[in-house]
Amino acid sequence: MIPTMNPEDLRAKLIRNFNDAKFEMSDRVPLYDGVQSARLASGTAAEKMGASIDIVPPGKRACPYHFHYVEEEMFIVLEGEGTLRVAGEMLPIRAGDTIFIPPGPEYPHQILNTSGKPLKYLSLSVNAETEICEYPDSNKYLAVSRKKGPMLDGRRMHRVKDDLDYWDGEA
């Protein structure tokens, strides 16, 4: 038997309208300030999917150049024009373009607004239980675990400085 739920609760768990989304403003000066982002999947029944609407002002970037080891991403350009920096290339993007980014070091990526008007797009991703991202421009990496552990509780960003031996610090 299928469990029943009242329609309002069911709608709240399953449906988001990005026209009603609450945006947060970034203040990361100078390249990322003014970027607006609204997370859509938060509070829904989705456990392995992420979605957001992002609005990037002219001359700004949505996030640093990076790649994922596990998660795939898709971006759907809703309004405006810009540039997809990917795999060492600069590719023009415009409203209607759908961008598919597989995981792996072959596809580091970043979306830049190189136009004179706002760039608005929908971001979709799988949310892996654990993930590692690398940031080639700044020589750092991000470790993410959606499971809580004694050492890794959420997100940890580190710069690659030392290459430690496997046994370093062990008794």
Predicted features and spans:
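Short, conserved beta-strand element in jelly-roll/cupin
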Residues: I53-P58, H68-V86, L124-A128
